[in-house]
Amino acid sequence: MKKMLSIVASTAVALTALAQQAPIAVRWEMGRNGAEKGYYSSRFVIKNVSQSPLEKNWQFYFNQFSRRLKLGDQLPVDIKEVSTTYYQVTPNDRYHTLAPGDSMVVDMLMRGTMVNICYVPMGGHVVMNGDTKKPIGVKIAIAPLDNPEQFQSRPNDYPDGNRMYAFNQTLQDAQAPAHCYDIFPTPKSVTLTGGHTSIGNVVAVKGGKFGDARRFMLDELKKRGVYATGNTSTTITLKADKKLSGEAYEMVVNDGKVLITAGSELGCMNGVKTLISALDHSKANRLENAVVKDSPDFGYRGFMLDVSRNFTTFENMKRVIDLLAYYKLNVLHFHFCDDEAWRVEIPGLPELTDVASRRGCTFDEKEYIAPIFDGNGNPDDLSQSSNGYYTRQQMIELLKYAKSKGVKVIPEIETPAHARAALVAIRLATISMPLPIWQWRSNTKCGTTTTRAFTPLPNHITTMCSTWRMRACSTFYIRWLTNLRRCGKMQD
């Protein structure tokens, strides 16, 4: 009952915060790279958009890749990095009350080079009177990057739209006329045999060996207004032939009949995907008669999706799987945990999602972790990519959904490096460095080397990943490689 009341109260606070209007509007403007050796210039323009004078009782927070700051000694605000990538802007003694409609400019020099839009500030929010439980979201307006010196440190080091357009202009038109089998990925062999086969609203489907491929095909045809029935002369036949190995298939389209032959379920599914793609690229479902032969060059055709840093919904995950299947990618590398968050419910460790799937304005991280990347400072706002997780039931459904479309899901468990979110959540006292110092620094590589830190994980990991899992060891330090004790732990 107490937990339910806590959730209701938390939600009420979240809705109140969302309903509030921020007293400031913030615009970020890029200056130029190399404004000072090793630094680029930028500025915030902070405007009082409220109806009252803005005193010193506010702090503005934002996220940005960690950069060493250089500030002028006459600025009316101080800027400090609260935790890695999380910055606080606070009025100082030089600050003068901002009247309604007035603005102030905060000029900054930041270490490094601005080369990509992902380097700009994001996740803005303002706190009034030090009340971090009631952050108010501030959408940071980003001024256009119009000049090359704003996003290039060397000539042509970033392929902007003009450069890509000029490159495309150099490509010559294809010599052969296009047909419906000009799809991606392109089949190895397409021989047009003359004539056409029209796929109407109804077809007869024959062959029952490849159940998954058959169900997938019927579902995709239905989405395109084509239904299976036994009373029509247009037929689609799925046939098994052991002479075709692996994921190879052949498809023959001829005078109202489509024959897909394969030696395996996945091979047949590839043939079905070619048929579906050809229909999408045809005019009124009118296929050229042809013999199509194809097989993938790579058994692993993967796509890595990082939902730790930027969460996406369960429905969006299914859409991603749909796209992978359509383009014959067969592996979803599922990066669901990192320093920034843990996104999958694990029975027995509720704190992993109670704490580590939520990011909000905090300095102690007792209830949720500090902001990074986008968000509005509110840990309970599920409209933000900073917050959210997948339930155990959703994960089971996602795995089944992927399998039905010929896609294998490989969850990635980030250990021992980049495991900060999980370690913050389970509050272990075995971490060898202070938690606020992390990401891009050496303790990411070797700060979490004690055995106890990862004791709770193996049993719970196996409940989720009974077939495949990847334990990412992306940031090994040289001291790991020369330390037999640590190497032994990893082997265990």
Stretches with model-predicted labels:
Residues 120, 124-296:
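Acidic, contiguous N-terminal accessory segments
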Residues 35-43, 104:
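Short, solvent-exposed loop/turn segments enriched in Ser/Thr/Gly
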Residues 20-38:
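Low-complexity, acidic Ser/Thr/Pro/Gly-rich terminal tails and inter-domain linkers that flank the onset
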Residues 74-115:
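Intrinsically disordered, low-complexity Pro/Gly/Ser/Thr-rich segments with frequent PxxP/GP/PP motifs
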Residues 1-23:
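Bacterial Sec-dependent N-terminal signal peptides
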Residues 45-52, 468-469:
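Asparagine-centered strand-capping/turn motif at beta-strand->loop junctions
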Residues 34, 53-83, 122-125:
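Short acidic, flexible loop segments centered on an aromatic residue
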Residues 244-246, 250-464, 472, 485-492:
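Feature activates predominantly on carbohydrate-active enzymes
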